[in-house]
Amino acid sequence: KDGKWTFYFPNGRIEKCVNYKKDTLNGAYLVMNADSTINTIGNYQSGKKHGDWTWYNENKSLEMEGGCTEGLQHGEWKYYFSSGELSYNANFNRGARSGQWTYFFKDGTLFKEGKYLNDQKEGLWITNYESGVLLMTGVYSKGKEQGIWLNYWENGNIKNKAEFKNGVLNGAWVSYSPNKNILLTGKYKNGLKSGEWKTFNDKNKLLLLENFKVIKSEDSKNEIIVIGRNQE
């Protein structure tokens, strides 16, 4: 095949217009719906997607749009809810997620945002409630949670404080009530509860004291047992 080729629906309307060069897609590429609205529009170069591409959903609203190079997503892309509102902005570097990614609720309020490096989450990421109030914040390193992560009540007070190492819970854990009283304290070791854990009511009264010990089971997997419990 060479040059422009046009395909038709049984009703005679155009289904697709494409261009070939020596049997390879090359040039403008257009796909239509049966009602003659656009489904997909883009461009090929030597058989691979190249340049700007746009897709529309069944509601005739934008579904996604962005650029390609040698068949790979490259640069900024935008994705939309089926009702037409912007869902998220994304960035790619030759097919790999790279740079800022920002997600939105339908009303445009920021949902979550952060960065990718070499297709992995990197640095500070935040997540919000639909009201716009901060829900969660923490740092990624090579795609894994690292350091202190904070989870918030919708009134802005801290709900949980946790420590991670290479994506696994390691270190202190503290849970708080909406009015800042401590509800739970303890430590994790390699993702499992370890040592003394205390549970309180919202009036700071100790309700439960537990001690955890990690042992190796017969199949060499870590198991956790409660070796002491004192319930008030």
Residues covered by each model-derived region:
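Glycine/tyrosine- and acidic-biased, solvent-exposed loop/turn segments at the edges of beta-strands
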Residues: 1-232
